[in-house]
Amino acid sequence: MLTEPGTQPSPFGLTLVGAVIQGSFNLANRRVAHPVRLHGCIFSDSITIEGARFDGDLHLRQSRLLAQNGHPFALLAEAVEVAGSLRLDNIFVHRGALLLGYSEISGQLALNDAAIWGSSDEGVAVDLQGSRVQDGFFMRKTTLVGGALRIQEAHFSRAADFSGSWINSRGDATAAIIGDGLKVDGHLVASDLRSEHGPVDLTGVECSRQVRLDRMIVNGPEDQAFSVALDRARVGGDLDLTGIRGMGSVTAESCRVEGKALFNSIALAHGSISVSGGRFAGTLEAQKVSLPKGHLDASYAHVGPTLAIGGDLHQNLAGDSVDARHIDVIGRVVLSSLKSSGAVQFGRAKIGALLQAEDLHLGKGGAGGPSMDMEQASIVGGAYFGASCNLTGPLRARNASIGALMQFSPWTRFGAGPNGVAIECSGLRLQGDFAARHIVCEGGLVADGARLDGDFDLQGATIGLVGSESRQGIRIEGAAIEGSILLAACRVIWGALRLTATRVGGQISGDSETIIKAADNSDLSILLNRCVVGGGIFFSGLRAEGGTSDLGHAEVMGPMHLEGGHYGRLLLDGCVAGGDVLLNEVRCLEGLSLRAMRVEGSIVLRDAKIWSRNENDDAVSADRCHVQGDLDLSGLRTAGERVSLRESVVVGSVAFVSVTTVWRSPAKESLDPAWRNFGTGDGIALGMVDFRHGSAKTLIFDSELAAPGGAPYAIDLTGVSTQDVFGFLMRDWNSAINFIRSTQQPNGALEVSETFARLFTSGGRPEQARRLLEVSEARRRGRSLWAVVLRVTTGFGHYPFRAALLTVLLLALMSGVAFVGRSHFVPTNVITSAVDAGAADPVLVAGQTPIVSSERCSDSYPCFNAFFYAVDATVPAIGGRQAEYWRIDDTTTGQRLQLIFGVARAVVLGLAAIVAGGVAGLLKRG
């Protein structure tokens, strides 16, 4: 009756409630015009409706399919066409599978609250492969025991919802849900789904709206490859995988998600999370994940506003817990509450905003590699390491580019790598500050070739640990830092501060809490080699222990403040300082060297204490220095061979006030520090200050200076050039006489002698005063002719002498110019014939050739002379006759000659003024 040809559809159709149907129910390849509603019926055998066409609904709700005939299916409905809905809610299948493959259902397919205990030969409990459902497929809270759900290549136009279902696929199926190639025009939801023996395979799924697989539980064997697979998926909305629990991995490789992708709170016993190569238009979150034996792979992914990662992770074979190499994030990256046994890889990553890390605890990478690797990464918005960051291994930012600052919160900790480096940022391009205050590095910090637009701030940082394998300290080679290097309260332990070929736009500063302790096998504490410092060096009170501090060959545009510092050996050889060099109260255990320094300001060694352990070395060596200001050695105390200032030039004053040079006595050798009770007690002998062949405007010394036993002078001033001397009576008056005899003083020698004479007279020694005046008078009588010439030419400054010499040279040059260009000089009165030669006013007749020129003379007209013309034209005051009889023609070359002679005339006038001033000064002096 249902399938009789010509039967008209009935709005009521066939409705059976609670019927028991013994035998087969077969409507295969039939057309059913009426709705069929079989509610609560019991079917002893299988239902076969394969190829049938239903013009209305087909309902089997609350029915029981027993399949006692032994067929592998309980419902065979492949290639069925249903114009209405197919509702299988609350059915119970005792044996066999539901085969609905390649069916066309215009309405809704509902399989809610069903229990299916059977499966096909392929291990499938519900088969919808290739089916098309117009109004959605709903399988909520359904139990599949023994088989899988296969929805391969199916197309659901409204939605697909498997929420709360329980699938125990114990058969031969490869997955609990086989959904590769599935297409859903609406939502795909599998919230709270539980799978006991197989994964969920949704590879290549296409969903126009969101996909929700949250709180899914996927159990399986330990060797299960994956729990959920969404590789190559296309999701038009959000992808929500929050709270998945499973054994294997969760993969979404090469997928495309137009909304947010949420991988939060995923716990995988043996698996990992992989989104490699995926494209996520929205936020990608993987926070509070638990991967005790897995890692997170986000390499080559493209992420929208935010990438957020956090949780407990293990590592892969390469030692990486988070692999984000080549990732492209439009917005920011947040690493929050991340604990891993491996490293975080951001090599060659592109981050459009900020990289932010907080509560970070990372292990080392493979082979002891870095805990965080940002090599060649590009970060537009800066990098920030917040509170509670602890990296067991080093941080690598080699050749990275960061568009803003790089900031570390206090007490951020970094371990050392195999090379002893804790932070490696060689080649870093940073457009802001490197702010690393109070960080703790178990190894060194290396920034070779870095480019920083801001400050390099290490205030309060601890670099290196005592006894660690690191010997690096702070190393910056070939870098350019536009800001300053700030080392206040910085502690460099078991290393050194090395700056080589580095340009610093600001200052390099430390303070009394800055400590640089060299390693036991190193002889270097500080090295500034070939550095350019724009703002000065301020190391007031800095302590450099255990090695040499070499600041030589550095070019410092500003001052150098090293006062109160403690050093081993301090070297400033070849250094150029744009301001003052302050070494007040400095302490040096192994000597101070200032050789060949160039200082625009003054050098102040006031109250400094310099110790030299090698008695053959100078305590202070400042030979060949050039100081534009003063050299103040007041209160200097040294222990060594001597203070050497040979051939130094001091434009200002040199003060030898209360200078004490001593050698160690045997009783002093056991004292530590070496200058305890410095300069007092028995066994201390005075040394000598060597200032031979030096130059200073003024010398200042006092009565504390005395020559030691066996030394001719307390201060050796042989060949010194000076203009004035101030001081008190010296203990040994012979030293004063020898000083006068050995000092070359082109000006003021008599005044110096008179100064000493007044000092000796006031001290009750008139005989010594008389002898000083005799020495001075003998020197004045013995001046040579060369001394007179020097006095005349340079006594009132070098400029008059040079001006006169330049005037003569300029006249000689202009003579040569006039001789070479003589063809362009014509007579002022043109002579046309011998008859007219004697005329008072000769006139040129048209067509006639002049008989007088600069190259041809006449008895009746003065000849042209190049030298006298040059003198007459450039020095008008002489009043010669050449300029009256000869002039330059109006040709192009002639106009150039006129310009040259005009310029020469102006120059000669200026030089003449300088010469006149010098002559006037000489006459006034005489």
Where are these regions (language model features)?
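Juxtamembrane "helix exit" motif at the C-terminal ends of alpha-helical transmembrane segments
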Residues: L810-S833, G917-K924
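Short, hydrophobic/amphipathic alpha-helical patches that form generic packing surfaces
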Residues: M1-T3, T755, R791, S815-F819, ...
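Pore-loop/selectivity-filter region of tetrameric P-loop cation channels
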Residues: W786-P800, H824-L909, I914
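Generic, well-ordered alpha-helical scaffold segments in large soluble proteins
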Residues: L759, G763, L772-V775, G816-V820, ...
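Hydrophobic alpha-helical transmembrane segments of multi-pass integral membrane proteins
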Residues: A79, V808-G816, V907-V915
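N-terminal leader/targeting and pre-domain segments
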Residues: M1-A787
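Alpha-helical transmembrane segments and their helix-start/interface "positive-inside/aromatic belt" motifs
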Residues: Y799-V808
